[in-house]
Every structure is written in structure tokens, then in C-alpha cells.
Amino acid sequence: MSTYLIGDVHGCYDELIALLKQVDFTPGQDTLWLTGDLVARGPGSLDVLRFVKSLGDSVRLVLGNHDLHLLAVFAGISRNKPKDRITPLLEAHDVDELINWLRRQPLLQIDEEKKLVMAHAGITPQWDLQTAKECARDVEAVLASDSYPFFLDAMYGDMPNNWSPELSGVARLRFVTNAFTRMRYCFPNGQLDMYCKDTPENAPSPLKPWFAIPGPVTNEYSVVFGHWASLEGKGTPENIYALDTGCCWGGDMTCLRWEDKAYFIQPSNRQLDLGEGEAAAS
């Protein structure tokens, strides 16, 4: 039994299947972890959702910002942008079933035995693991409820950007969503910066990548995340694994086999344009 962790799929169904064949992934024996952003940009979002859903207990995933945006488009809150290439999904006969499955997926995955944590954008250094669990449950409960469209309508925005246990209501849910699905940079005190999307060497002072600021979770656990394609999987501490390597922008789809830390790469079927990716991603 092996554990395979794969970065953002973004509708790149053919590359996902090729990568799983490359590692001889066997559902029922192996477990697949996915860093979120299953949909948008690539041509096969519908096939990706159908396939991942079919894996049942053999897959563990987290929601990304593009997955949440899909839910908002489905609910009539956000506009369907042609560049996301999700129209075939929205028009599919089983779209209701797929959406209801997707909105019941978590924001956080934890394996205590492996001391492994996964979230789409990472874990803010302002949280310990118990706080992260509680915050994830808050958003997950709303997404799984009948009132999820009201949350999706209120989730867009960059404030508040500083964690406090006193946060409540929409402000709390928005901070949690941004921390789990959109975060890249923090100020030295852990406060989120939601504007900078440059690579770390070009980021203005005093901003630092979230993983460069010591926090309770990263001090005790390994953390796997996606979201940040321009990192190209590089520049993180030894126990932090950046797995989004920009497949939908012409980069690669990356898989990490946890047991021996072996990497496997599947080249994209698209022409390389990582600059396009970071400019377009939220």
C-alpha cells in the first residue's frame, strides 16, 4: 500500500490518468491525496470530477479556490468565465450529483500516523492544529448545508486578514477560506497579505511566504500544499512540500510517493506559460 500525493489537477484529466498509470496506482490498495483545484483551466474538469468521485475511500482531497469558484458559478453567484472551460461540467446530466459531492469535501486533511497535513494553500502560522481543525469544520459545515449559496456570496474579499479567536460570522468564514485556499504571503506576525503573487525572490519586504514563518503546525508536522505554481515545487523547508507545478499552464503534474519521498512527473499537454498562470490565479 502506497500513498500518492498529487498537486493541482485543474481539469488536466489526461495528465492525471497518465501519472497514475506511471506509478501503478491501484484503488483499494493505494491512497491518492489531491491538493485541490480539481477543476478549471484544463479541458477535462468534468472527467476529473467523475473519476475522483469514483475512487471513493481511495482518495483524500481538499478544496481549492477554483473548486469553491465552481460552486459559486453553479449557485448563480459568480460568472462562468470561458477561460475556466467548465461549461461542459455545468451542462452535464450529473452536475447536481457532482456539485453535491464536491461541496461536502474538506478543507483540511490530517494523518496523525504519518504526521502529515494537507491544505490547498497551506496552514497559516497563526494557527495551531486544533484551531485549524475547528476553522475547517466551520466552513465545511456551511458548505454542506442548504445555505451554502449565502456563504459563497459572502466569501469573496481580502479582509479580515489577521486571525483572532474573536472573529465570528462572515468575517471568520472569509478569513478561514482565504487562509486555506488563497494564501501565499504573510507579514512577520503571520497576518495575511492577499495581494502579492510574485515569486519569493521578487516579493517586497517585509512579506515572507507563509511557510518561511515558523508556526505550531509546521514545527510538528509535514505540510503538503498546492496553489502556488510559480514556486515550481522549490524553495520550501524540508518538511513542506509544494506540489502544484503548473500542469494547466504547460508545466508538469507532480506526484510524491510518501513512503520513500520519490517524485514522479507527467509533462503537460499544453505550452508552458507559468506567468499566465500566476496572473490568472486568485
From Swiss-Prot:
Q: Which GO terms describe its molecular function?
A: bis(5'-nucleosyl)-tetraphosphatase (symmetrical) activity
Root EC class: hydrolase
Q: Enumerate the UniProt keywords alphabetically.
A: Hydrolase
Q: Which domain of life is it from?
A: Bacteria
Could you confirm whether the keyword Hydrolase appears in this record? Answer: yes
Q: What is its EC number?
A: 3.6.1.41
Question: What CDD domains does the database record attribute to this sequence?
Answer: MPP_ApaH
List the residue ranges forming a coiled coil, or say none.
none
- Reaction catalysed by this chain? P(1),P(4)-bis(5'-adenosyl) tetraphosphate + H2O = 2 ADP + 2 H(+)
Primary role: Hydrolyzes diadenosine 5',5'''-P1,P4-tetraphosphate to yield ADP.
Family listed: Belongs to the Ap4A hydrolase family.
Q: Which NCBIfam families match?
A: apaH, PRK00166.1
Q: What is the protein's name according to its record?
A: Bis(5'-nucleosyl)-tetraphosphatase, symmetrical
